[in-house]
Amino acid sequence: MGRMIASTFMSRFSAAQLGYAAGLKGYLDRPASLEFLKTMDIKHSVGHWSAGDFCDRFAPPGYHSDDPGFGTDFESQCRRTKAAGVDAIEIHQSVFEKTMNGDLDPAAIERAQRGVLAELGMVVTTCNINTWTNPKFRLGGPCNPDPALRKAALEEVLKGVEICKLMKIPVLSVWPGSDGADYHFQIDYKQSIEWFTEALVTVNKECLKHGIKLAIEPKPYEPRELYMIIPTAASAILVAQQVNKASGGNNCGLTIDYGHQKMEATTASTACDLAAFAGIQVHKFDINDARQGRNDQDLMFGTISIPESVEYLYTTFVRDYRGYYSQDQFTYREDPTRAIERSMINFANLALKAVRIYANQPALDKARQAGTGPDVLDVVSPVLVG
């Protein structure tokens, strides 16, 4: 078993990459961070919303609404992301709808592809689905008690498939943001999760036709206050298994959000390993930070718990994850460009620590066999706090 684990773990980086990382000294600034991520082939992206304005119930107009020069359109979000040093961005299907949950806007897609994306040399890595902003979905999207609205929500997800086809986006990610319950007895959970699974089976069959990966993103609660329909990584894995069983293949997988796992009072590292144990792929990781058991804070990455962040990245390397780590952060009062840049630099520096622990796997394996905290800390602490 030890030899099998070592073989798996050593597949993520080449000897040349590990040698390069071993030669790096001190703190990585912005140029060094960008070079490190490129050399190590660690992919980094940003959700378009993280480069926009931010609203909450305390500042409904938006924290940057007093700045007439602050654009909130997709082009402005792309330009801020690129200015932060990141050349990959995620979208929602609603970015390319004529109105919220209205008709697709192929002309807008073409303008973006030929215009700002081409100009900046940017790629779109994931299409997410919004079935919560429109008030018609206030009681749910794919799990709405009204069958007509369940159908409308399914159509929104299928629009995402169409956008992926048109823009050659490899991943479609579904976070059911309005589905769940606020009160006990409000829904029949088994019925609701069956509706959700049935919708995803339909979507996954379309994804399979076009080589698009389908991901489910779990979250314990918020905006639904009792629970979301997919509240845990384990529940997402169960649904993905059912979707794959009904569709054939293993195309349906997970999006794991770092902060959502903190809300769940587990870790993104254990969620990654649980998916690997179950044979379910992780198609995307959302990075941010949050305090354990609190709300979805979406802070800049690496600002709360460095050991936990490093273990998470280490685990993704051990499990040979090669997709994108995408910023999903709501830095309400900050300049989004500076916040994106700061997260990227933090991410690169913590990824370097994770690579160094990864490269010292035999020592970590030996310490784990001893089973004590000090033995393990003897291996990792020089990297974490040295």
Where are these regions (language model features)?
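Short, electropositive alpha-helical surface patch
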Residues: 102-120, 146-150, 181-194, 225-241, ...
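Flexible, acidic glycine-rich loops studded with aromatic residues
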Residues: 96, 309-364
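A short, acidic, amphipathic alpha-helical segment used as a generic capping/interface helix at domain edges
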Residues: 28-30, 270, 304-318
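Active-site-proximal loop/turn and secondary-structure-junction residues that shape catalytic pockets
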Residues: 50-52, 93-95, 128-133, 176-180, ...
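N-terminal pre-domain/capping segments
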Residues: 2-170, 248-252, 344-386
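Acidic/histidine-rich catalytic cores of soluble enzymes
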Residues: 39, 46, 52, 58, ...
